[in-house]
Amino acid sequence: MKKSWLSGMLCLLMCISCTNVPNPEEYITDCEKSDFVKTPRFEETMAYFQKLADVSSMVKITSFGTSPEGRDLSLVIVDKDGLQSPEAIRQKGRVIILIESCIHSGEPDGKDASMMFLRDMIIHQKDIDLLDDVSFLFIPVFNVDGHENFSATNRINQNGPEELGTRNTAQQLNLNRDFLKADAPEMRAWLKLYNRWMPELFIDVHVTNGADFQYVMTYAIDNRGTLMEEGLRKWSLDIYEKQLNERMTEVGFPIFLYASFRKYNAPESGIIIDTFDPRYSESYAAVHNRLGLLIENHIYKPYKQRVLATIEAFKASARILAENKESLVKTIAQADQHVASPEYRTKPMDLVFAPVNKDSVWVDYLSWARDTVKSDLSGADWVRHNYEKPITLRCPLITSYEGTLSVQLPEAYVLMPQWDKVIDLLDLHNIRYSRLTEPKEMTVQTYRYTKATFSTRQSEGRIPVLKTEYTTQMETRTCPAGSVVIDMNQPNGRLAAWLLEPSAPGSLVYWGFFNQVVQSTNEFWIRLPYMEEKGRELLKKDPALKAEFEERMKDPAFAKDSQAILNFFYQKVKKTAHQNNELHPAWRVMK
């Protein structure tokens, strides 16, 4: 208590740069003035943050990029000493929390919560002692172009505010599918920011629809599978997630995991916690060995409740990190060291996880009484919730998850130098690599594609590759000068695998970066009759092929089919002529 009082007085002296203490009435947000009916536009939002910066040396505003429509991607840095670099802040022994709002700009809860949370610290001195141990980065509006596409019809089933932005960007991209492929200029700027600051905690604020329940807020932390390193996964469960639930319940906003049910609209049938891959925000943090919290506020709850609950989640998270920062920093360092070690690669890395029935726990789930009636409008069964009758259900929560798809990590990847767009992504994701200065012969494991299944619909402006089939073999190949060598003895080695492995969900193969080799379009301009000459030549030169041909000729049907005979040689020549057409350009150096 004494430390908190002293910290508050010191910060008050530091943060107020004008002669008189600001009038608190001047810092009521536009959202509060409207009784949480309205949310401000981008210009008004940043003007408010600038107003706080004008009276506090702890608040700095900068830009980390520009949107396609030319708007600033604004970043608000809050540090007790006014520091503006991660190195300087960490030298002071503080941890960093990145709070991102409006990645889907029709979901503005985090933006208004950030304004009020920071105002309460700077102007009202509430929880000001948090700044002794924590510095904050706020992105008030990530999808800034979508945010300015204001309309009352963008999310008609959402309970406020009355006008808001759109889910997608001006380029019609969903930023929360873009963390790996980074098609959007906004995301490319964000990746540079994130990989420079590497915040200990990243909070991404959303609003969800779907199931109906009493909770104002649900959440996700990708710690059910093995995406998060085991030591950090345990820390996130035993300390962060446990205390977050306790603290939110104490302030009147109990929370629950972002979940689905075994049967539609029936939590009592079993609650399943979905796992995600690093194309999504909280999972991108997890694969970096950092905490990622996805907040999914409930779309049917009043906007005021959602904003106030979000503020409490910010405070609770910051308090947990402030009180446990030494153990968190140590755990993260150990996680980075572990995933960069040869020991980590002794076991396959899971890519897909699925819940299994062998373990579950009974939990209380705050729901509503419901009944099913025959709709007089559509004739369908209509499930209706009775908001006058809150109920607590005892439900099984599945706690066991097993990997259903895995890959053995190599010692290194070798990527051919002509794949410049992929190499650019390695830089954006801060994946370290070296380049060969001259050609080098190496024994590598390769993938050769034999079949690909493409989506019949576009996604994010791309045609996803839903499934690939390929052979795996060891080959001795000459790697050309300029080839990129990605040593897996680095914390971001796992991220390289998520990008380059064909079977990884959300990989660059999935998004079509390698379509030229997944399904080669090169034509083989040799006519079948030429095989009359070439076949004889091959039989003279290649004893193994001659033996194979003679074995085939024992089949009477084959021996009588002149086209099949010529095609036998045709396929042999085609395979030799275009032996690299279906070769995946990321080769694997195995132990």
Residue ranges of each PLM-predicted region?
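Accessory, solvent-exposed terminal regions and/or long lumenal/extracellular loops of proteins
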Residues: 492-494, 500-591
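Acidic/histidine-rich, surface-exposed loop or edge segments in extracytoplasmic proteins
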Residues: 22-37, 99-101, 174, 227, ...
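Active-site/substrate-binding loop(s) of hydrolase catalytic cores
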Residues: 91-100, 108-267, 273-276
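Soluble metallo-hydrolase cores and metallopeptidase-like ectodomains found primarily
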Residues: 43-97, 124
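C-terminal motif of bacterial Sec signal peptides marking the signal peptidase cleavage site
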Residues: 14-17
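Bacterial N-terminal signal peptides that target proteins for export
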Residues: 1-6
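Hard-cation-handling environments
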Residues: 261-444, 448-449
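Feature captures C-terminal
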Residues: 372-526, 531-534
